[in-house]
Amino acid sequence: MRVKHLDISNHKIWKDKNIKPEAKEIYAYLFAEGFERTISHISIGRIQRELKSITNIGFRNNLKILEKNKYLVYKEYDTGLYKYHIY
């Protein structure tokens, strides 16, 4: 059995100029949380523990940018609760 290791240091998102640094940080957190999962769920409260200054609207706007640039797909199924899939 082969074990997968989490390595996001060489990911193409770091060189993408269309993505804001805050969105890159969110992507890295979501990537680590959803590692080896098809679909993951997250609440804005868990994100706010890591990124103190982010609001639900700011988080949603960053997810829209990431979705537009084909890094993930998300859906807000309740206020502050999201499910997402990383490509």
Give residue spans per PLM region:
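Long, low-complexity, charged/polar intrinsically disordered regions in eukaryotic proteins
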Residues: M1-I13
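Winged helix-turn-helix DNA-binding recognition segment
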Residues: K17, P21-E22, A32-Y87
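Pre-recognition alpha-helix immediately N-terminal to the DNA-recognition helix
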Residues: E25-Y29
